[in-house]
UniProtKB/Swiss-Prot annotation:
Biased composition (Basic residues): 101-123
Family: Belongs to the universal ribosomal protein uS13 family.
Designated name of the protein: Small ribosomal subunit protein uS13c
Coiled coil: none
Gene Ontology molecular function: any one: rRNA binding
Length: 123
């Protein structure tokens, strides 16, 4: 089982898809990594040679922010928005959508399940 950036890649998936299991690497990044490493994107993870794995690992270490570093940067930027009290930061703090979506109805995923308010009936 190939282990890259602290993540065990799934054995039976193509390497192009397997690399997307690493936080911070999507499909486009995965394709560009494989192109630079000159590894066929249709090879299964279990069929990779040690040389291929080391090439991929080296490219990811040099050029990409992945896993813990990427998560830390994301949380720090959200924390910074909340500290400077900008609109996006306040929306993060209140658990509401950030990008102008309506909240009178919908937005259930972001706001959580319904909370019944006592004494609120239509007159």
């Amino acid at each position: 089982m190939a282990r890259i950036a602290g993540v065990d890649l799934p054995r039976n998936k193509r390497i192009e898809i397997g690399l997307t299991y690493i936080y911070g690497i999507g499909l486009t990044s995965s394709q560009s990594i494989l192109k630079v490493a000159t590894v066929d994107s249709n090879i299964r993870c279990k069929d990779l040679t040690d040389e291929d794995i080391s090439k991929i690992r080296q490219i990811i270490d040099e050029d990409y922010l992945v896993e813990g570093v990427a998560r830390r940067i994301e949380t720090m930027s959200i924390k910074r928005l909340m500290e400077i009290n900008c609109v996006k930061g306040r929306r993060h703090r209140d658990g509401l959508p950030l990008r102008g979506q309506r909240t009178r109805t919908n937005a259930r995923t972001r706001r959580g399940s319904k909370k019944t308010v006592a004494g609120k009936k239509k007159a």
